[in-house]
Design a protein with these regions (language model features):
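Interaction-mediating elements
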Residues: 11-308
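C-terminal motif of bacterial Sec signal peptides marking the signal peptidase cleavage site
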Residues: 6-9
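Gram-negative/organellar outer-membrane beta-barrel architecture
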Residues: 154, 275-276, 292-408
Length: 408
């Protein structure tokens, strides 16, 4: 079978239609700079050759080529499913790749970059090369922060944390990261409705000397919002109450009277049947607290903490505005399977002796309603010795893991 695949892999043109060409190679050569590797640019190619192993063997194409023209045969169906159809060269996709490569270079500050292609056609196969000429990159001459809101202005002007510095090479990826940083800081300081899509960058590259001036500011559509809508974007919201719904399905039961409920210090807990976790365990693992400002960082930490608790399968956290500057937080929890039993049987062979081993395990992921994990494992083996003897071996282990959720 190996030799069949090797032969068919060599005959890569078997399934290439007449008048068409197999895209055999697609290489990228970057000139004028060592800061951009050709491998980084391959993601922008709109058409890539068939997958190669060891740099030359198109194994999946070879598997595809083993299929006969009769697609009703089982072998042909599976060969086409497992294999990889030949990549037929497309001049249209090559043109798109050229534009994408040029755009990628411009996004890295190479505004005058150019991309040319060359082809070598032989034996119905195309070897394509993209020649990328980088030219001199543009650098940031001046960086301006232009926000009327003082909170936003202070965050964006923080030169210690800002990703944009004068003199650095222009890079749109860094600009987008700076947008995310500024928006995240706003949301970590109570601005629930603020979003990175509200921020834009304006670039002026007419200064000459391969330099560009950058200004960070609000999108134009913000000015078309009403006064109330604009104030809402920059308003600091506080958490009024935190509601824990300890059963994902029960939280959707229309008849609230069928649920168990407890209230404590601004926290509300609802559940049906057995309580998933103790109240203190949930509070300890949820840094979102009544009376505090909304903080996106604490939201992320709450997801991380709660998802690590074994009794919890799924976490969803939503916020509900209840006044002009207050939010209610709803933490919806879905319980996982708390008890599990496992059994494993295997044959053994050691130094000519045959045997059999049986292993069993039990786990409880919420022993004291505080996300404690109790495990009990055992293993027994029986071995027939060549000298006529017998060997029996057994071992057991027990463990109890206390989560940070444990509250006393």
């Amino acid at each position: 079978m190996f030799f069949v695949l090797l032969i068919t892999a060599c005959n890569t043109k078997k399934c290439v239609p007449q008048g068409e060409y197999l895209l055999n190679k697609a290489n990228i050569k970057v000139e004028d700079t060592k800061d951009v590797a050709a491998a980084e640019l391959r993601t922008y190619l709109q058409q890539k050759p068939n997958t190669e192993i060891l740099g030359f063997w198109k194994l999946q194409l070879g598997i595809y080529n083993t299929a006969s023209l009769d697609t009703t045969k089982w072998t042909s169906k599976n060969a086409r499913k497992v294999g990889e159809a030949p990549v037929i060269f497309s001049s249209e996709l090559a043109g798109r790749s050229t534009k994408q490569l040029q755009l990628a270079m411009q996004n890295r500050g190479y505004f005058n970059a150019s991309v040319d292609t060359s082809m070598v056609i032989k034996d119905r196969k195309v070897n394509l090369t993209y020649h990328v000429t980088a030219e001199t990159p543009y650098t940031i001459r001046h960086y301006h922060v232009n926000f009327a809101n003082t909170d936003l202005q202070d965050i964006a002007q923080n030169s210690r944390l800002s990703l944009i510095q004068e003199g650095m090479q222009f890079n749109t990826d860094l600009l987008n990261q700076e947008r995310q940083r500024v928006a995240s800081e706003m949301r970590r300081n109570g601005c629930y409705y603020f979003d990175q899509d509200l921020i834009k960058f304006e670039a002026d590259s007419t200064r000459g000397n391969k330099q560009v001036d950058i200004t960070i500011c609000l999108q134009d559509f913000v000015n078309t919002m009403s006064v109330e809508e604009q104030e809402q974007l920059f308003r600091h919201y506080k958490i009024a109450h935190v509601h824990f719904h300890m059963d994902y399905e029960a939280s959707r039961v229309p008849d609230g009277a069928s649920l168990n409920r407890s209230v404590k210090d601004g926290y509300t807990f609802t559940w049906s049947g057995d309580k998933l976790l103790r109240e203190k365990a949930l509070i300890r693992n949820c840094p979102i607290r009544p009376g505090d400002e909304f903080n996106e960082g604490r939201l992320e930490q709450a997801y991380s903490n709660l998802n690590q608790l074994a009794p919890i399968k799924y976490v969803e956290i939503n916020f509900e505005p209840i006044s002009s500057n207050e939010l209610d937080c709803h933490v919806i929890l879905s319980r996982s399977k708390l008890n599990s039993v496992s059994v494993e049987v295997e044959g053994t062979y050691s130094a000519g002796d045959w045997g059999i081993a049986v292993g069993a395990g039990y786990a409880n992921r919420n022993l004291f309603r505080g996300a404690e994990e109790f495990t009990l494992d055992g293993r027994a083996s029986y071995e027939w010795r060549q000298n006529g003897g017998r060997a029996i071996e057994g071992k057991a282990s027990m463990g109890l893991k206390f989560s940070n959720a444990l509250a006393v």
